[in-house]
């Protein structure tokens, strides 16, 4: 009797694990993309331009034709002008399609000398495009505009 209960328990446990793991495998690309976005966010706040640029594709295109090199210069300029940079992301909407994704979010960017309050702040609506290449997500394009326009 006890072995029958143990067998049922084991079958039930295996079934739960299979369902849980199958849910994880479907969400894995989205989880990796969200982790990549979070790593970029952390790198920007830590003023690590190289780390922030790691997922940016060589063929990146941003606002008004900004390329990857221009994006790097834009980050450098912001870091030269602001001792402290803050990034606060709003809800992140991820839409996956095969090996590409579109990610939309609101970002509050702050900058200043590092004292109690930032000297400048701006909220942006951001739409980004991503490509999955060799298991890594690459940022291929980004559009941003000040919120409320």
Task: Report residues per predicted region.
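Residues that act as N-cap/strand-start positions at coil-to-secondary-structure junctions
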Residues: 36, 86-88, 124
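Hydrophobic/anchoring residues in structured secondary elements
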Residues: 49, 94, 142-144
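Surface-exposed, charged secondary-structure patches
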Residues: 77-120
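Short beta-strand edge/turn micro-motifs at domain boundaries
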Residues: 26, 102, 120-149
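Short, low-complexity N-terminal intrinsically disordered segments enriched in polar/charged residues
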Residues: 23-55, 72
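Sec-dependent bacterial lipoprotein signal peptides
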Residues: 1-22
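Short solvent-exposed beta->alpha transition segments
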Residues: 53-90, 96
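Solvent-exposed loop/turn segments at secondary-structure junctions
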Residues: 59-61, 109-110, 146-147
């Amino acid at each position: 009797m006890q072995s029958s209960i143990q067998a049922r328990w084991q079958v039930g446990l295996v079934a739960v694990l299979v369902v849980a793991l199958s849910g994880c495998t479907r969400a894995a690309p989205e989880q990796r993309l969200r982790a990549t976005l979070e790593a970029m966010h952390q790198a920007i706040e830590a003023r690590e331009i190289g780390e922030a640029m790691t997922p940016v594709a060589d063929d990146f295109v941003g606002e008004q034709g900004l390329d990857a090199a221009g994006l790097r210069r834009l980050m450098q300029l912001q870091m030269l002008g602001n001792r402290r940079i803050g990034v606060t992301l709003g809800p992140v909407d991820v839409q996956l399609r095969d090996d590409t994704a579109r990610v939309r979010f609101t970002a509050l960017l702050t900058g200043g000398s590092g004292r109690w309050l930032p000297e400048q702040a701006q909220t942006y609506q951001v739409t980004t495009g991503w490509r999955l290449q060799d298991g890594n997500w690459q940022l291929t394009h980004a559009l941003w505009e000040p919120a409320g326009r």
